Amino acid sequence: MEPEIKIVNVVVSTQIGTDIDLEYAADILDNAEYEPEQFPGLVCRLSDPKVALLIFRSGKLNCTGAKSKEDAEIAIKKIIKELKEAGMEIIDNPVVSVQNMVATTELGMEPNLDDISTLECTEYEPEQFPGLVYRLSDPKVVVLIFGSGKVVITGLKVIEDAYIAFDKISATLKELEQELY
């Protein structure tokens, strides 16, 4: 049975120009904050799609909080449109690349994290963090497994890797269960 995997955060980056005047951009963009003594970039929050965009003087733009790459691209297009309408030199259709995606799913059981922690590439320090950290090399992702059966997969570049990672973890847990019980 295919697990229900839900993307909860997509982080993308792009280049929208060079030498961006962040003070001016902060004045023209709604919901923008620019406090260079606290953070070197301009932070702009949109409500539809609900994302945060970080714009740096170098022209680099990061978008976080999107539920899909498409939502991030919509948000970036909105910001580009506003900046261009204000007379700023901005790249029209910048290449957007996914830096990280975070997905959640469920194992469908309550795993024994102490047992799983005997596997290679795992870390489990319940006094410090309630989840078991399982680092996979192919795909190169980090899987957090909680005692409730909830799973968080991070480090994704494509959604397909979430399914591959989940299948690998599920198979490994089945093998471990057969060895132990």
Swiss-Prot record:
Sequence repeats lie at residues 7-83, 98-173. The keyword Nucleus does not apply. PROSITE patterns: TFIID. InterPro entries: TBP, TBP_archaea, TBP_CS, TBP_dom_sf. Gene3D superfamilies: TATA-Binding Protein. Keywords: DNA-binding, Repeat, Transcription, Transcription regulation. One of its GO terms (molecular function) is DNA-binding transcription factor activity. GO terms for biological process: DNA-templated transcription initiation. General factor that plays a role in the activation of archaeal genes transcribed by RNA polymerase. Binds specifically to the TATA box promoter element which lies close to the position of transcription initiation. Belongs to the TBP family. This is TATA-box-binding protein. It comes from Methanococcus vannielii (strain ATCC 35089 / DSM 1224 / JCM 13029 / OCM 148 / SB). The gene is tbp.
